[in-house]
Amino acid sequence: MASITLTPSEKDIQAFLEHYQTSLAPSKNPYIRYFLKLPQATVSIYTSGKILLQGEGAEKYASFFGYQAVEQTSGQNLPLIGTDEVGNGSYFGGLAVVAAFVTPDQHDFLRKLGVGDSKTLTDQKIRQIAPILKEKIQHQALLLSPSKYNEVIGDRYNAVSVKVALHNQAIYLLLQKGVQPEKIVIDAFTSAKNYDKYLAQETNRFSNPISLEEKAEGKYLAVAVSSVIARDLFLENLENLERELGYQLPSGAGTASDKVASQILQAYGMQGLNFCAKLHFKNTEKAKNA
């Protein structure tokens, strides 16, 4: 039976209780504040602030708090660089790419912090732990602003090759700081053949072999760290753009983005959209025709 112990914030505990309030059950243990009987798991929340999750579904419910099940592979237990990007699927905001260097002796610290793939963490949790990661973990962060993104897309780069360039540059600059990884993992966004094709266009190169792996953020803590820091960088950029324009900019590329894009186009013209959005997205044409 799986057993996981966590020490999340009181705010996260209350959010968990609110989400699963129908599963609350009585407990005779005086040290247990709350006890929940969930499908395939029980959750004991102690007066000390610790949480004990037990059962086959323990990992699923622990992920609510940012817990990440780490695969114990030989690669995971090596000092390695992992990279990830955030923003490529969002109309508004820039493109953030981060490379992080993590050693095995940092794994316990990262797990206790609740590091997981940024896609499973709330934005609030990401903003909370990202500053700690930036201070404790060697990394290289790059942000391509929307205006710079629009400048290079269609000229020298496309939506895939620009990511190849940023991942390569982030790794290159991190290696220049003297880190010595035994493995470099990129959260795969294209095939290895495509990556190598576009990499040939780049000036800054390194001899270390790289591995492109799908869902790498769930396998390697270094990639998970990069995912969190990149998400934080993207959110920070989005907030800065919002302050500049006076509009709330949604993440993603759905109908909410269409509506705001139309408003910005009316207020500032194409110059305004160029400042805050990736113009090659279909949202731009929808805004023009609104």
UniProtKB/Swiss-Prot annotation:
Cofactor(s) needed, names only, are: Mn(2+); Mg(2+)
Cofactor note (record): Manganese or magnesium. Binds 1 divalent metal ion per monomer in the absence of substrate. May bind a second metal ion after substrate binding.
Task: Please provide, alphabetically and separated by semicolons, the GO molecular function terms listed in this UniProt record.
Answer: magnesium ion binding; RNA binding; RNA-DNA hybrid ribonuclease activity
State the GO CC annotations.
cytoplasm; ribonuclease H2 complex
Gene Ontology process terms (BP): DNA replication, removal of RNA primer; mismatch repair
Q: Which InterPro entries does the UniProt record give? A: RNase_HII/HIII, RNase_HII/HIII_dom, RNase_HIII, RNase_HIII_N, RNaseH-like_sf, RNaseH_sf, TBP_dom_sf
**Protein's cellular compartments:** Cytoplasm
Task: Provide the E.C. number(s) assigned to this enzyme.
Answer: 3.1.26.4
- Reaction catalyzed: Endonucleolytic cleavage to 5'-phosphomonoester
Positions of the RNase H type-2 domain: 78-290
Q: Which SUPFAM superfamilies match?
A: Ribonuclease H-like
Q: Which UniProt keywords apply?
A: Cytoplasm, Endonuclease, Hydrolase, Magnesium, Metal-binding, Nuclease
Query: Where does the chain bind a divalent metal cation?
Result: D84, E85, D187
Regarding protein family, the annotation reads: Belongs to the RNase HII family. RnhC subfamily.
- Could you tell me what this protein does? Endonuclease that specifically degrades the RNA of RNA-DNA hybrids.
The protein's name is Ribonuclease HIII
Organism, scientific name = Streptococcus pneumoniae (strain CGSP14)
